[in-house]
Amino acid sequence: MFNFKLDSFQEKAIDAISKDENVLVTAKTGSGKTLVGEYQIHHSLQKGKRVFYTTPIKSLSNQKFHDLKKIYGDRVGIMTGDIKFSPHADIVIMTTEILRNLLYKQGTPIGITPELSLQNLDAVVFDEVHYINDPSRGSVWEECLVLLPPEINLVLLSATLDTPEPFVHWLTDLKGKMCHLISTEYRVVPLIHMTENGEVIMDAKDTFHFEKYKAWIRKYYSQQDELRKHKERVKAREEGQVIEKEVRVGSFLDRMNKLILKMDKPALFFVFSRKMCEEYASKVSTDLLTSSETADVRHIVKYHLHKYPELQTMEGYHKLTGLLEKGVAFHHSGMLPILKEIVEILFDKGFIKILFATETFAVGINMPTKTVVFTSYRKYDDAAENLRVLRTSEYIQMAGRAGRRGKDDKGIVIYLPIHEPETPDVVKEMMTGKRATVESQMKFDYSYVLASLGSGKTIENDTYWMRQNNQEVEQYKDELATIKRELDTFTMKEKEHMYEFTQRAQLQEQIRYGTAESKKVVQQKISKWDNSHVGPYWDSMKKKHERHEQLVARSHKIETTLDSLKLFLKDIELRKLFLEKQGYIENNGLTQKGILASEVHEAHPILLTEVYTKKLLQTNESNEIVKVLSCFLEHDETDTKSPIAQLGKQMQECEILKTDWIVTDYWYDVVGDWLEGNNYVCEQYGIEHGNFVRAMLKLANIVREWVNIATLQQDTEMIEKMNGIEQKLVRGFVIPNSLYLRI
C-alpha cells in the first residue's frame, strides 16, 4: 500500500490493526500519525466493511472528505450537521457529536430515525482524540468510546500525552480486547526554535539554551532603549510632527517586515487576535508573488468563488483578495468559512508565502509550512478571563506546523514578540514542560439522562470518569487511613500539652482585635506562657503540635473532597427526580414529552420542550418563532435574564435548571432583520461574518429540531407554518457548503 519506508511506530500500529486490535497513537504534529488512520480505512474496505472517521471540527471534516475522496471517490460520504452527503457510504467523515447522537439512537424505535447506520461498520477512527480533555466537549468522546459495540475496532490518534497508560488500561478493560499504546516523540523533520535574530532557544534534541535566551533578552532591551532615545530625539527635532507607526525603525512592524524579507518561506505567523491578524497582514510591505503567480491566484479565486456574487459587496472580501494577490493572507474564525477555505487551498498550492492566523489553524488542518513565527507566548483564556502562557501541549501543536515532510530538512520556529519577551524560566517551562494527561470531562447533564433513558444505555459505571473517580476515592481512603494511624500515635498527655499551643494561638488572635488596654494584658499572658514553655521538651511538643495540626487539616480536606465526589453521583438522581416531576420520565423510561426533549441537541432540551408543549409560540408567526429560538444561540456577552417574555416564565418554573442553560437576547433583533431581508446586519450590528454564519447555521439546526418535535406531535399547523423558514435563514453569504466538497 505504501511505496516508502514506514517509521517504527507506524509499523507497530499497522500490525495491531491487521490483527483487528485497538490502538492509541500519540505523536507530535507532523510525525505521520494520520497514515495509521488511513491504513485502518484500507484494511476495513479490504474486508468488505465500512469505516467512520471522526474529527473535532467541521472544517477538518470537510478537508478530510476532500483528501479521502481523491483516493476513494464516491465511496466517501460526510455528515457534519450543516452538510449531509451519502451517509450510507463505505467511508463516512463526521464530527464526533454526530456519532454520539447516532449511538444513543441506534437500536431504539423512539423519536426520529437517524440518517446514519452502524450496519456493516468495522472501525471508527478518532482524529485529534486529545479533545477528550476539552472541558466543554470532552464528554462527547468519552460517551462514544463507551457506547460503541466492542466488536467495532478503534483507532485513536492524539497529540503527545503524559502518562496515557491508565486511559489505555481502561479502554482495554471496557472493550475486552487489547488496546495498544503506541507513542513516539520522534519527528522526521526536526524543529529548531530561535529568536528573531537567529539565536537558538531550543535545538533539535529539545535542549533549552537558557543562557543564550537570557543574552538575547538583554540585547532586546538594549535595542528597545536605544529606539526609545532615538524617538525622543526625533520628536524634539520634529517638534511634535507625527511619524507613521508602520515605518518607525525598530517597531514591531519594522522588525516583522525585515524578518519576512530574510526568512525561509512559506511562513505562518501565529497572532492571538483576529483583528491583529488582519492588521499585520495589511502591513506586509513586499509583494511576494511573480506576475504569473498573481494571475494564477486570480484564476483560482474566481473559479471557486464566482458562484457567490454577494461576496462582491463585502469589504472583507476585497481586503483579503488584494492580499492574496501579494502572496499574503489571514485566517481566523471570524471569517466566512468559504474565505478561510480559499486561503487554505491557496496555501496548500504554495501561493501563500506569509499567513497570519489564530490558534485554530493549528487544529488538525493539514497545512505544514517551512517556518512558524510566534508573535506572543500568551493567549486569552475564556475561563480565566485573562491572558495566560501557552500550555506545553498547545505550543508543541502550533510549533509542529513547521517543517514539511519530504521538502524540508528542518522546521524553523521563531519568536518575534509584539510586547516584552517572556522570562527564560517561563519559556523553558512552556517548551519543555509536561504534556496533558487524559482527564475525564464527562457530564451527567439533562441531555445525558434523557439519552441514556431513551436508549436504555446507562453508561455511567463504564465511563473513564467512574474509573478515575473510584481510583481517586481509594487513594483518598488510603491516605485517610495513614493519617489516622499517625494521629493514633499521639498520647493523651501529648495531646493535652499540644492543646496549650492552641491556647497560645488564641491569645495571639486576641491581640489583633483587642483595645490598647486589653492588648497589654494579653501580651503579659503570652510572655508568661512563653517563659513557662522553654526547653527541649516544649520544643519537641511544638513540632508535634504543628504536625498534628497539619494532619487534622489534611484529614478534613480529604473528607470534604470525598463528600463532593459522592454528591456528584447524586446529581444524576436529582436530575431524574426533576424530570419525573416535570413529566419527562415515568417508571425509569421516557414519556412522550421526554421523547420530544431527547430530539433536542442544539438548544437546551428541557427549556425548548417546555416552550413547545406549553404552546407558548403556537399563535406566533414563523419569523417571531425563529427570533425566540435565537435566544438559545450562545454569545460571549450572555445574559440569563433574557427579556424575551415567552421564555421568562418557563425559566422561573425550571429554576433548578438555571446552571444548565445559556439564553441571550443578543441575536433577537439581528435575526429579525435578517429574516426581513436585511443583507447588511453584520455591518449594522458590528458582527464578524464568520460568527454570523455559524450562528445562522446553528439556528437552522434548532429550527429543524423544533419541526422534528412538531412532526412527532403530528402538529401539521406548526409544520406548515415553518415551511420555507430555513431558506430565509440560510441564504446569501450564509453558505452551508464547503469548497472542499467540489474540488
Regions found by a protein language model. Give the residues of each.
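Conserved nucleic-acid-binding Ia/Ib motif block in the N-terminal RecA-like helicase ATPase lobe
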Residues: K49-N101, H169, H180
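Non-catalytic terminal extensions of ATP-dependent helicases
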Residues: A329, G334, D348-I352, M442-I743
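Conserved pre-motif I regulatory segment
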Residues: M1-T26
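Conserved segment of the helicase C-terminal RecA-like domain
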Residues: M367, T371-E429
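Conserved C-terminal RecA-like helicase domain
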Residues: R50-T54, N62, K69-I78, L253-D254, ...
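Conserved interdomain linker/interface between the two RecA-like ATPase lobes of SF2 helicase motors
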Residues: V146, N153-V155, T160-T172, G176-K283, ...
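SF2 helicase catalytic motif II
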Residues: T96-R100, G107-V155
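Walker A/P-loop NTP-binding motif
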Residues: D15-N22, G32-K49, E142-L148
